[in-house]
């Protein structure tokens, strides 16, 4: 994991852990690059992305220790998810993931399973065609007008500023689709993440932020495209090197 020394993790009143700028940071700056601790690809072979990741994390003591620090620490706001979550969990018993079912069922209570499920729902990232857990990326709080966007390649998640950031300003990304309307965003945030969004856009008007949101989406598309281009160039260069030195194995890594 690489992090710009101008950003820092702090405690923010009414929010908990968050990220702030220790100095002015220009727009379009890469401020963090992180390798997920767990990834699952979602395709027609996927049985349950949530429990596949939970198994990977909870069966590894080091990953489990990091994951348990995530919020929430209580299941009070997530009781409405219990039935659906446990229904999905019990389906594993008769699937090819029976080993996942047996491990979780033998080691954790239903309340613990719900809590770990809530931690997943509140902290997992979409990652290519799947889901991922990032320890530091999860520390950014949400805004419907974020000043940070995140994009991924095959291995890493990259975090960029989308406008000039002032010293002391909180750095935020988005948990839901910022192109959706206020009602849709607030419902999704409350149902999945357990909070009522009070960002400047949610207490104001979507119309006032339309151009800014469009610009943020354009920035995300631009950086995603740039990372894809750089990754392809890296792979092409490695392929050329392999042809020149066929006995030498070169591992493709993102720039």
From Swiss-Prot:
Residues 5-176 form the SET domain. Its EC number is 2.1.1.-. It comes from the Viruses. One of its GO terms (molecular function) is methyltransferase activity. The keyword S-adenosyl-L-methionine applies. Residues 235-255 are annotated as: Disordered. Keywords: Methyltransferase, S-adenosyl-L-methionine, Transferase. Pfam families: SET. It is an enzyme of class 2 (transferase). One of its GO terms (biological process) is methylation. InterPro entries: H3K4_H4K5_MeTrfase (IPR050869), SET_dom (IPR001214), SET_dom_sf (IPR046341). SUPFAM superfamilies: SET domain. CDD domains: SET_SMYD. The keyword S-adenosyl-L-methionine applies. Belongs to the class V-like SAM-binding methyltransferase superfamily. This is Putative SET domain-containing protein L678. The lineage of its organism: Viruses, Varidnaviria, Bamfordvirae, Nucleocytoviricota, Megaviricetes.
